[in-house]
């Protein structure tokens, strides 16, 4: 879901607004979040809302992945969980760097590629036998 909202951000060029983190303007939640009517359209067409939801999903996903990797690593020393733990921090950092650099192409491309790496690491961790997780 986070990757899908990232695609919305890229497709709408929504990363070109609110180039600060964690604030979006003068608040954490953008003032024009629900500017369009009907309200559900904001989820897909409102640049500020799309960027906000990608940020929120990224933080939530990051927290879940960190907790999962830390818990799984306690039961096994398989290196995939170390890579997963470290990569999620790198991915969030790349997302923030993409924003503050006003979507500098090399950083933005690495952030998109990083999403593929993170997804691959999550799948690899889930493919281990349950007793290894």
Describe these PLM feature segments.
Residues 1-133:
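Polytopic transmembrane helical bundles with strong interfacial aromatic enrichment
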């Amino acid at each position: 879901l986070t990757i899908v909202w990232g695609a919305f951000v890229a497709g709408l060029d929504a990363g070109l607004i609110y180039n600060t983190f964690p604030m979006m303007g003068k608040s954490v939640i953008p003032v024009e979040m629900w500017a369009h009517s009907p309200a559900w359209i904001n989820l897909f067409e409102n640049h500020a809302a799309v960027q906000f939801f990608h940020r929120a999903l990224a933080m939530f996903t990051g927290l879940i992945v960190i907790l999962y990797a830390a818990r799984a690593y306690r039961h096994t020393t398989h290196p995939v969980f170390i890579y997963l733990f470290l990569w999620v921090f790198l991915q969030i950092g790349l997302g923030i760097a993409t924003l503050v650099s006003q979507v500098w192409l090399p950083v933005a491309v690495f952030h998109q590629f990083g999403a593929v790496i993170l997804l691959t690491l999550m799948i690899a961790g889930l493919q281990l036998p349950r007793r290894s997780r």
